Structure formats: C-alpha cells, structure tokens
Design a protein with these regions (language model features):
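Outer-membrane beta-barrel domain signature, strongest for Gram-negative TonB-dependent receptors
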Residues: 65-171
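Predominantly transmembrane beta-strands of Gram-negative outer membrane beta-barrel pores used
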Residues: 1-8, 14-60, 67-75, 83-87
Length: 171
C-alpha cells in the first residue's frame, strides 16, 4: 500500500521556481495566501516542448504533455483544517504531416498512427477536526479520465475518419 501526501505551502514567504529541462519547462509556487500564514498554496505546472524537438528532428509524430498539481490548505483554528487538492494532466499527440519528402519509415508511421487527446484529473476537498483521542476527517473527491483517438483517410481532415474512438470515465 502506498501513502502519498502533499505537504502544505510555505506559511511565511513566497517561494517560486522556474524549471527549464531538456524536454519541458515548469513553474512552482510555494506561498502563504493569507497575511497570517494560516492559508497556504503549493502549486506546480509543467509542459513539454517535445513537439518542437521532434519536428526539428523530422519525426512523424509531435507529442505534448502537460501536468499540474496544487494544494490549498487553511488552518481554521487549533483543531480544524480545510484543504483543496488537485492533480491532473492533459496530453495530445498530433501527426507531423508537414514533413518534406518523408522516407518510407516516416510514411509508414504517418499511415497507421492516430492522433490522440488524453486528460485525467482528481480533485478533492477535505475537512479535519482533531480531538484529544483522534480525529474526524471528511473528504469528497472526483476523478475523471478521457481518451480520444482519431485518424482521417490520408491524414486529410476534410476526409472521413477511419478511427474515431472516445472514452470517458469518472467517479
């Protein structure tokens, strides 16, 4: 069993970070929201730029991924706390149909690979009241996943789709 916990944000001062990696960039915030530091925010967002790298390399597919997470926590008193959390992603893969003189391998991949869009998230809210001998915790949450695959004849969007798949799940 795995137990993962998001920590609270920094109650005393703003901290931020910009991240530039080989394939993505991101931003993180870790900060008080209220003057007294009882409400804090911890948040991050990341986005790939693989689509630009893959295009320069002449690859026939151009992926992009995005993900985010956050926790907004508020200490309502010595024994009470409220929080909101979220974690999610949205990704898509499109075909590089602008290749000049694609080779046989590129043509093969362009011929069968569909484009897709995918997203997922979980959001939750919780309330905690601490007693001397225990605690009361009330939590509500929602999660969802969407996956769409599609392919057009000869990769021409004015022609009919040969693949049109869409699934959505949520709890």
């Amino acid at each position: 069993v795995m137990d993962m916990r998001m920590r609270d944000g920094n109650p005393t001062r703003f901290k931020g970070k910009l991240i530039l990696g080989a394939s993505d960039f991101g931003i993180n915030f870790d900060t008080p929201v209220s003057r007294n530091g009882k409400t804090t925010l911890l948040a991050s967002y990341r986005r790939s730029y693989l689509q630009m790298l893959f295009s320069v390399l002449g690859l026939p597919f151009l992926p992009t991924y995005n993900d985010y997470q956050f926790k907004l926590a508020s200490k309502l008193g010595a024994s009470d706390e409220f929080y909101l959390i979220g974690l999610g992603s949205f990704d898509y893969n499109r075909l590089n149909t602008g290749l000049k003189d694609p080779d046989d391998d590129q043509k093969y991949i362009l011929g069968y690979l569909p484009e897709n869009r995918q997203s997922s998230y979980v959001f939750g809210a919780g309330y905690v009241h601490r007693f001397r001998a225990g605690q009361l915790r009330v939590v509500v949450s929602r999660n969802a996943f969407t996956n769409k695959l599609y392919k057009h004849e000869r990769n021409d969007k004015s022609l009919p789709r040969t693949i049109d798949y869409n699934t959505e799940q949520s709890d």
